[in-house]
């Protein structure tokens, strides 16, 4: 089940609005 994470997509960059415990480059 995917996590729902609030985020904003700005200037081509995905910016989560809260701390996300994923390693750099990791996808879920």
Swiss-Prot record:
Domain of life: Archaea
Protein name: Putative antitoxin AF_1079
Family listed: Belongs to the UPF0165 family.
KW Cytoplasm (keyword) present: no
Keywords on record: Toxin-antitoxin system
Species in which this protein is naturally found: Archaeoglobus fulgidus (strain ATCC 49558 / DSM 4304 / JCM 9628 / NBRC 100126 / VC-16)
Protein function: Possibly the antitoxin component of a type II toxin-antitoxin (TA) system.
């Amino acid at each position: 089940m995917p996590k729902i994470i609030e985020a904003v997509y700005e200037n081509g960059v995905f910016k989560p609005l809260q701390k996300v415990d994923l390693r750099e480059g990791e996808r879920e």
